[in-house]
Amino acid sequence: LELLGEGDFFHHYDSSDPLAQLLAMPQEIEAPEDPVLLRLLPNAYSDPEAALDFRRFTEPQLRGSKQRNLRLMREQLTILVDENHGGVIENIDDGLWLRGMNDLRIALSIRLNIDEKSFEKYELMPDEDEQKSICAVYFWLGWLQENLLSTITDL
């Protein structure tokens, strides 16, 4: 959420061009430099000009959608902890949670350089290694995602 922008990020996309403002045309948006953001908000085309043009019209909504998903997840988890609901979140939006968990796993996988051999590496990490607990969160989110998908498909 911190990378995507905690507050309303749309003002960053407003153009300073009066005609563009009148026509509600967003300004050009550069691809993010942060590897996590680049993975969460990828280029749609290999052609740089086409990618920037596409990004200009889609990134604000995509970023906003990802922000909303993560904010709602945080709110529901906060309520769960504050009101001691016994580990059950009421009225869950399955799609929102799946998308949010996927974005969290993508962010963690980039930061931790997760690959197909990472679970074996994780098991060999000493308990004192700071990354071990973060890796545990990554794998736990995968387990949680899989269980949510199983529950949805069983309905």
Where do the language-model regions lie?
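Charged, alpha-helix-forming regions
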Residues: L1-R68, L72-G87, D93-L155
